[in-house]
Amino acid sequence: SYDLAVADNLRVQFAEIGQLNPDRETILTYIDDPKWSMVGKAVYQMHCTSCHGANGEGKIGPNLTDNLWKNVKVVEDIAKVVSEGAAGNAMPSWKTRLHPNEIVLVASYVASLRGTLPAGTGKIIPGEVPIPHWGEPPATEQAPADAVGSQESK
């Protein structure tokens, strides 16, 4: 069937990146990756829009585009909530329905939605609190050893 063909293709593609860890560094690394962010977006569109909206604005589930979060304090918490669920199963666990890499990639996509809707729009959930910025993805290149200025002085 088509679904099996898509699943087989995804497994072949995942062989390129191996098993992804649902940690801060990995999630931030894949936020801006053109190929893999599309996989995260596809997972989101297939499984998340009915509760969180097409743009993450929130419907039944919370707004994912603002700085107010209830079950997430750091970026890796997104993968944990996707995997384990939250709010007494209002947010279901996806760990038995998604490949572990899909969980990491959808977490990266959800993290990328932050700040994409104008302030004051989207659904507000009682108990949400402001959280710090996710931070920057890890550097992909090492600075030359003879670079002007040292990292310690910054």
Annotate the PLM regions.
Residues 92-154:
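Flexible coil segments in periplasmic/lumen-exposed cytochrome c-class electron-transfer proteins
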Residues 41, 52-53, 57-84, 93:
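Gly/Gly-Pro-rich "capping" loops immediately C-terminal to redox-active cysteine motifs
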